C-alpha cells in the first residue's frame, strides 16, 4: 500500500514528465564529472527499450490526480523536486485498471503496495519469480491469549489507499494508544499472486526491532481480509518534505543518512535485503527522526547466489539488477547512494524522463557531482555508486559505511538512542496530528468496507494460504 504518489510495480519511469529541463539543485551550480566503472556484460538495448516502453505506457495512463496537482504546484513555485517514483517487480503485469488503483496510494506508516510483476526483465535473465517458487513458507503461530481483532480498534482517519486495501489511523479501545492499521483484501492478494510477498513482509517485520524501522504490533485476519497494526508515524514522508524544499542541507542529510545506514546494517546482519529504499518509504516521526516503512519487496537471502527477482523502483535500481545478475544486500547501498544524491541535489544521479535512457545511464553514465557538495560527501557517493559490486562501499558490511570520513562525527550509540540533534522537526501538534498527511485521504470516511461475496470465492477457497498470520508483539504481551 503506498502513498499519494504512483507506486505501480510494473509501470512508469517513476517521475512524471516535467515542463522544461529538470533541475538539480540551483541552476547556477556547476558540476564536476566523476568516472565510475563500466559493468560487463550489459543488457541488450532492445530488451531495455521493451521494458522501458512498457513502463512509460503504464505511467502515461496511471498518474493520479493528486500527483498531477503536486507537480503543477512544483512548476508554479519553480521548485526542483523529485516526482512520483514507481516500483517495479517481475511476477505478472497489472491491468490498466489495476495500475490506476495503484496511483491512489499514500505511503504512511508502513503502508505497502505489495509487489506486482512484469513479464520481462531488461535482459530476460533470472527466473524473475523467486519469491513465488520457493514453496511453503514457515509460519509462526501466535500462542498467546492477547491476539487482537478488528473490533478492538476504533477507526479514526483514512491515511492511505492502495490496490489491495487501505491504511487507517486507529485507537485501541480502552487505551490511549494510536496505531496505523493496514487492511488488505485477500482476493486481491491472491489474484495478483502476492501471497508470499505479503506473508514475507509480516514475517520480516515481526522478527526485527530497530529504532529507525516501523514496528509491527498485531497481525490478524478475517475470512476476507488481513490486518497489520503498525506504528503511527506522523511527521510526513521524506518525499513530501524534499518536494517542498527542493533539496536539503548537507548537515541535515548526514543525520538522515546515518539513521538509514544504522537500519540497513541491522537488516543486513540478519540477511534481509530491503530492495525499495526511496524518499516515499521513509517517514519522519514527530521529533524528526526517520522511520523506514513498506517491506513488501524485502527478502531474506537464503543462498550465496542471492536473489534474481527484477524488482525495485527504476531510479534506484542497482546495475546488477538491470543486468539480471543475482543480487544481495549490496543493492541497498547503491540505492542509498542514489537517495543521498537526491536529497543533496533534488534529483537522482542518473535520472531521465526516458526510462531506457535512464537504465543506460545507470549502467554506463557519468556520475556528475555538483561542486557545492563537500569532498567527504563526494567520496561517499562515489563509493556507494560504484558499479562493480565487489568494490562498492558497504559490500563488506555496514561497518565500512559507518567508518567513512563523512560520518566521523557521528556517535552511533547515541544515534540509535535518538540522542543526536536533528536539523528539522516536523510541525505536528501531537502524536495524533494528521496535518502532514494528504487530505485526499484524511477527508475520506474511515470504515472497514465489506467485500462482495462474488469476489470472495477464490480467496475463501484458499484460506489456508494465510495460515499462521496472527501475531502479537512481545512488547504487547509484557504490558
UniProtKB/Swiss-Prot annotation:
Gene3D superfamilies: Phosphorylase Kinase, domain 1 (3.30.200.20), Transferase(Phosphotransferase) domain 1 (1.10.510.10). Its EC number is 2.7.11.1. Residues 1-136 are annotated as: Disordered. Keywords: ATP-binding, cAMP, Cell membrane, Chemotaxis, Cytoplasm, Kinase, Lipoprotein, Membrane, Myristate, Nucleotide-binding, Phosphoprotein, Serine/threonine-protein kinase, Transferase. Residues 52-65, 79-96 have a biased composition (Low complexity). CDD domains: STKc_AGC. One of its GO terms (cellular component) is nucleus. Induction: The 2.2 kb transcript is probably induced by exogenous cAMP via a cell-surface receptor-mediated signal transduction pathway. The smaller transcript is induced by starvation at the onset of development, with transcript levels peaking at 4-8 hours during the aggregation stage. By 8 hours of development, the larger transcript is induced and peaks at the mound stage (12 hours). Required for morphogenesis during multicellular development. Phosphorylates talB, gefN, gefS, PI4P 5-kinase and gacQ. This is Protein kinase 2. It comes from Dictyostelium discoideum. The gene is pkgB.
Amino acid at each position: 500500500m503506498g502513498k499519494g504518489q504512483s507506486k505501480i510495480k510494473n509501470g512508469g519511469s517513476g517521475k512524471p514528465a516535467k515542463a522544461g529541463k529538470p533541475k538539480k539543485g540551483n541552476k547556477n551550480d556547476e558540476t564536476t564529472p566523476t568516472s565510475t566503472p563500466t559493468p560487463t556484460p550489459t543488457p541488450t538495448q532492445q530488451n531495455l527499450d521493451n521494458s522501458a516502453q512498457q513502463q512509460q505506457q503504464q505511467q502515461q495512463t496511471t498518474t493520479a490526480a493528486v500527483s498531477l496537482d503536486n507537480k503543477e504546484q512544483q512548476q508554479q513555485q519553480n521548485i526542483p523536486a523529485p516526482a512520483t517514483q514507481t516500483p517495479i517487480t517481475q511476477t505478472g503485469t497489472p491491468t490498466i485498471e489495476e495500475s490506476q488503483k495503484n496511483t491512489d496510494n499514500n505511503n504512511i506508516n508502513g503502508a505497502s503496495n505489495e509487489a506486482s510483476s512484469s513479464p520481462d526483465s531488461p535482459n530476460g535473465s533470472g527466473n524473475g519469480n523467486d519469491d513465488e517458487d520457493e514453496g511453503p513458507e514457515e509460519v509462526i503461530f501466535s500462542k498467546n491469549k492477547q491476539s487482537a481483532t478488528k473490533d478492538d480498534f476504533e477507526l479514526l482517519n483514512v491515511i492511505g489507499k492502495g490496490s489491495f486495501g487501505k491504511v487507517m489511523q486507529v485507537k485501541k479501545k480502552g487505551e490511549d494508544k494510536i496505531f496505523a492499521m493496514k487492511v488488505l483484501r485477500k482476493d486481491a492478494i491472491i489474484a495478483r499472486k502476492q501471497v508470499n510477498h505479503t506473508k514475507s513482509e509480516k514475517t520480516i517485520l515481526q522478527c526485527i526491532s530497530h529504532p529507525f524501522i516501523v514496528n509491527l504490533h498485531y497481525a490478524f485476519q478475517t475470512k476476507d481480509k488481513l490486518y497489520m497494526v503498525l506504528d503511527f508515524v506522523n511527521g510526513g514522508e521524506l518525499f513530501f518534505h524534499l518536494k517542498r524544499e527542493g533539496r536539503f542541507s548537507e548537515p541535515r542529510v548526514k543525520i538522515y543518512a546515518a539513521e538509514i545506514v544504522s537500519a540497513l546494517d541491522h537488516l543486513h546482519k540478519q540477511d534481509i535485503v530491503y530492495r525499495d529504499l526511496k524518499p516515499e518509504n521513509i517517514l519522519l516521526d514527530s521529533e524528526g527522526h526517520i522511520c523506514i516503512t513498506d517491506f513488501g519487496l524485502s527478502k531474506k537471502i537464503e543462498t550465496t547466489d542471492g536473489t534474481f527477482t527484477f524488482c525495485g523502483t527504476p531510479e534506484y535500481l542497482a546495475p546488477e539488477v538491470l543486468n539480471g545478475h543475482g543480487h544481495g544486500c549490496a543493492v541497498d547501498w547503491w540505492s542509498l547512494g542514489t537517495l543521498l544524491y537526491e536529497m543533496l541535489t533534488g534529483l537522482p544521479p542518473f535520472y531521465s524522463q526516458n526510462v531506457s535512457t535512464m537504465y543506460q545511464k545507470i549502467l554506463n553514465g557519468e556520475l556528475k557531482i555538483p561542486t557545492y557538495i563537500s569532498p567527504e560527501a563526494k567520496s561517499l557517493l562515489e563509493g556507494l555508486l560504484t558499479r562493480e559490486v565487489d568494490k562498492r562501499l558497504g559490500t563488506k558490511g555496514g561497518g565500512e559505511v559507518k567508518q567513512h570520513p563523512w560520518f566521523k562525527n557521528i556517535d552511533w550509540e547515541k544515534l540509535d538512542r535518538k540522542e543526536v540533534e536533528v536539523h528539522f522537526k516536523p510541525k505536528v501538534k501531537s502524536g495524533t496530528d494528521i496535518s502532514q498527511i494528504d487530505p485526499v485521504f484524511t477527508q475520506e470516511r474511515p470504515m472497514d468496507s465489506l467485500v462482495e461475496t462474488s469476489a470472495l470465492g477464490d480467496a475463501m477457497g484458499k484460506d489456508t494460504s494465510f495460515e499462521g498470520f496472527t501475531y502479537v508483539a512481545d512488547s504487547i504481551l509484557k504490558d
